[in-house]
Amino acid sequence: MGRIANQTTASNDTDPFGRNEEVAKMEITVLSVTFFVAVIGNLSVLLAMHNTKKKSSRMHLFIKHLSLADMVVAFFQVLPQLCWEITFRFYGPDFLCRIVKHLQVLGMFASTYMMVMMTLDRYIAICHPLKTLQQPTQRAYIMIGSTWLCSLLLSTPQYFIFSLSEIQNGSYVYDCWGHFIEPWGIRAYITWITVGIFLIPVIILMICYGFICHSIWKNIKCKTMRGTRNTKDGMIGKVSVSSVTIISRAKLRTVKMTLVIVLAYIVCWAPFFIVQMWSVWDENFSWDDSENAAVTLSALLASLNSCCNPWIYMLFSGHLLYDFLRCFPCCKKPRNMLQKEDSDSSIRRNTLLTKLAAGRMTNDGFGSWRDPCNSRKSSQSIGLDCFCKSSQCLEHDCSRKSSQCIPLDCSRKSSQCIPLDCSRKSSQCMSKES
């Protein structure tokens, strides 16, 4: 993986039969560690997701397929490159050379664009939450299926570019090299790979996270304005679709996880593509030992990306690590610690939701619900944020026999209202969309 393509039209100023053995040993060591860490990490994630008792979500689906894409990278990019470095030359038939080169680029496309689709899903969940109610699982499967199909098609040209050929006429030494009829062919190929696998995805990711950050900032601003107005006139702010209370802690955690995955991708792959572009666009570039070391180091850094992702999943999703440890009876103590942390987190989350619900009610019965943000988007409402023409209340087993019901602004003609689990003397109830 030191070079995306070995062009047969390159100059042969250096000895084509030799190599720097010290650099080769370093490559073999790093690639071996990378392969085993990537396989163990991604298998752990897949095993944890298979054994989890939690309901599968869209995010779990994307994580699962991103792990599968990283497994493709490990077995069909890192492993062949490791064998290649051990043998120095490619020892195999021509069709195997073409297949290996195809699968190497297939893994790169699949892993990259699966990450892009996962980011797009987070963008929809944060910036357009109502769209997540419209067959979200079906949309996720379409996004994942299209990613695999496009990756397969975009990597197909490898079959026509690479073949088993002599590294020098009359040398009788063969290797799996790329053939370019025109001198500019190698430049076009490297530029296409760089744009398709790195530049376009990075631009899409930056745009998505720009909108996500703007949406979160806007909602924080709305929450601050609502809190200030509530303090002044005692009114209760309306809970809008774009409210901070709707952007749950779980969604924000998945956004953070996706952002870390994106940053790890950029850090690992940026040096590799920079060096590759430098090698084909700089006419003074030569493949001597010093520059070969730079190419090698950048390629090794790129290969580390496939073994970073599973540990990022484990870090941001505690239950995956717990579900993985459930497979090993000897890990009972750390498993219990993770279970306790997850339980404490659930208690804190439920307590926070109870306080938020109680904070929306006025003590004297009916409260006014208003939205401090004047934007049309923030005025859209679901569930709690509405005034109904009529509502029905169900009595709750509280200290008082009657329960007070807050009328809500619904788009429907009627809604059913159920009381909260009250600890106060009077019970208050919130609407439930019928």
Swiss-Prot record:
Tissue distribution: Expressed in pituitary, liver, gills, swim bladder and lateral line.
Positions in the Extracellular compartment: 1-27, 89-98, 163-191, 279-295
Glycosylation sites: 6, 12
GO biological process, one term: cellular response to hormone stimulus
Domain of life, per lineage: Eukaryota
InterPro entries found in the cross-reference section: GPCR_Rhodpsn (IPR000276), GPCR_Rhodpsn_7TM (IPR017452), V1R_C (IPR015076), Vasoprsn_rcpt (IPR001817), Vprs_V1A_rcpt (IPR001224)
Pfam families (alphabetical): 7tm_1 (PF00001), V1R_C (PF08983)
Molecular functions (GO terms): peptide binding; vasopressin receptor activity
Ranges annotated as spanning the membrane: 28-48, 68-88, 99-119, 142-162, 192-212, 258-278, 296-316
SMART domains recorded: DUF1856 (SM01164)
Disulfide bonds: 97-176
Magnesium recorded as keyword: no
Main location, first listed in the record: membrane
Membrane topology classification: Multi-pass membrane protein
Cytoplasmic side: 49-67, 120-141, 213-257, 317-434
UniProt entry keywords in alphabetical sequence: Cell membrane, Disulfide bond, G-protein coupled receptor, Glycoprotein, Membrane, Receptor, Transducer, Transmembrane, Transmembrane helix
The UniProt record lists the keyword Electron transport: no
UniProt-annotated location(s): Cell membrane
GO cellular component assignments: plasma membrane
Matches recorded under PROSITE patterns: G_PROTEIN_RECEP_F1_1, G_PROTEIN_RECEP_F1_2
Protein family (similarity comment): Belongs to the G-protein coupled receptor 1 family. Vasopressin/oxytocin receptor subfamily.
Function: Binds to vasotocin. Produces an induction of membrane chloride currents indicating that it is coupled to the inositol phosphate/calcium pathway.
PANTHER family listed in its UniProt record: NEUROPEPTIDE RECEPTOR-RELATED G-PROTEIN COUPLED RECEPTOR (PTHR24241), VASOPRESSIN V1A RECEPTOR (PTHR24241:SF17)
Name of the featured protein: [Arg8]-vasotocin receptor
Source organism: Catostomus commersonii
